[in-house]
Amino acid sequence: VIQNAKREIYMEIWSQDFKFFEKELLNAYNRNVEIRIVGYDNFNSRFGLVFEHAFGRDIELSLGGRMIIIAADDSEGIVGKISSLKNDISDTNIIWTKNKGIVFIIKEFIVHDMYLIDVEENLVEQMKYIYGKGFKRLKDKVLGSNATYMIH
């Protein structure tokens, strides 16, 4: 997917998984492919535009793994979960697709996270006032107050 990209790559990835993609992403960046990343868990990159997701640990605990999400040139995508259990990959599931409709949804998911991260970073006090600490009121509204699924 990364090697095939000509214009843009959008991705969401945890810092410990980034090392497996960094060389190819740097090659793409050096080919003038725009790289936009939502990074989790103290993420750091020397290239591309990075949005740091603040709830990486919570999401990983809730899912039992780390998401990997990539959209390239509106034509190819990857989405899945990498298991947190070091010796058990049975819960690791990743799909690759060239279905443009699915790639569109993958990219929209990433872009949506980027918008929210930027808003959260710039309106910290307002968000806390409106939604409470950790966005509790928003999570309760969207997911229900008894939800066990706490992805954000």
Where are the language model's segments positioned?
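Interdomain hinge/linker segments and adjacent boundary elements that couple functional modules
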Residues: V1-M11
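PLD/PLD-like phosphodiesterase catalytic module centered on the HKD motif
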Residues: S15, F20-H152
